[in-house]
Amino acid sequence: FYEDATRYAFTLEMSFLADRYQQISDDLSQLDLFKDFIVSDYDVFKSLIFSKITLNEDEFVLYRKLFYQVYKDIARPDLYIYLYQNTERLQDNIRLRGRDYEQTIESSYLDKINTGYLTFIKNHPEFNVKIIDISNRDFIKNRVDYLWVLEQICS
C-alpha cells in the first residue's frame, strides 16, 4: 500500500471498513450486566479520517456514503481520548516496531494523518474528546508517565 497507495487505497479502506464494523458489532453484542462499557484503541471514525487522506475525491464520496450507511445505528462513545504524538515520535515508533512494510512511510503522510485527526476533532464539537500530547512521554517503560496519562484521562 505505502509504495502504490493510489492503486490499493480503495480496496484497503473498504476492507478496513468491513473489519472495523465486525469488531465494533462483536464488542457491542457482548455488553451485559457485568460489563457495561467498552475500552477500545480505535473508533470507526478512524476509517473516515484515513480514507479522506488516501482516496481520491470520487472514491471518498462513495466511501463516505457507504460509511454513514454502515455506521448509522452504531452508538458513539461517551468519551474519546486522543493520544497525540508528533510526526518525529511516530517515526521513532515505526522504526522501533520494525515492520518492513512500514519503514518507507514518509513523514508527509504522517503529517497528513495528524492533521486529519485534529481537523476531524475540530469539525465535530459534538464529540466529547480529550487530547493528550504524549510526544515526550513513554507510558510503556516509565510508570511516572503512565500515571500522568491516567491522571490526564481522569481530570
Please name every model-derived segment:
Residues D27-Q30, L66-V70, T119-F120, Q152:
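A generic secondary-structure signal
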Residues D92-S155:
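NTP-dependent small-molecule kinase module
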Residues D43, N86, S135:
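Anionic group-transfer/hydrolysis microenvironments
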Residues L33-F34, R76, P125-E126:
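Short loop/turn elements that form and flank the Walker-type P-loop nucleotide-binding site
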Residues F1-K65:
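ATP-dependent small-molecule kinase phosphotransfer cores
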